[in-house]
Amino acid sequence: MDDMKFSRRRRAWGAMMRTLMMVCAALTCALAAFLILYVLAKGVPHLSWQLLSTKPSYLDDTIGILPDIISTVCMVLATLLVVLPLGVCAAVYLTEYAANKKMVAVIEYAAETLSGIPSIIYGLVGQMFFCQFLGMKKSLIAGAMTLVIMNLPTIMRTTQESLKTVPQSYREGAFGLGAGKWRTIRTVVLPGCVDGVITGCILAVGRILGETAALLYTAGFAHTLYGGLRETLESSGATLSVALYVYAKEQGEFEGAFAIAAILMVLALLIDLAATLTGRYFKKRRSL
């Protein structure tokens, strides 16, 4: 009799927890869907070729985000150009070369700590060091260097964890064939962890696109088209996320702000999709 009561109580408890989890999952999906649909509904009607292909004109009272798109592309490329080699090389050293495990643990802890620091602190430090101490002033290159520091832990840790998934037998097989340490890393280990590098790169791009606070301190918020690449990097410029803040907060241009928000929302969805498909592709290729 007691066993029957316990069994009924356990089934009731299981059903209740299952229902609770379903409600939580449905609520999460509903909130995400509402946010995405609301932003798209508010922003897509205001998207136009004129908005995407012109610069803002205060005399004509028109909004254009072409300078912001160019600044965003330059910011992403400049950041990745520096942070990818640094992060991958640091991960390779910590995983394949470093013999002092205590030092590795300290560096890993420091990287995880850096990942949790608010971005506005990075912006303040970047302004003091890059803009003032190094004399870069507010510029895209100063913002990119600040984002390098912000995203370095992400690239390093994702690459490091991916390196650890490469079986030790692969390394031993390469050594047995007479390959040296660096040749083994270059031809066997790194190709085996390319999914981690790509995933870290995609995550970094997502963070760069969404960053605002740090760039307000270091890159500024100018909406200006410049002649050459060097002039663009050495001048102040607003990325799309910074432009969204400026239009919504400073100028009250909510139509332009929602249009930019819709663009960023689509980019975020595409980045998440790319990360998911990349992970599935390399997982399937490893299983072959």
What are these regions (language model features)?
Residues 159, 181-219:
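Transmembrane alpha-helices
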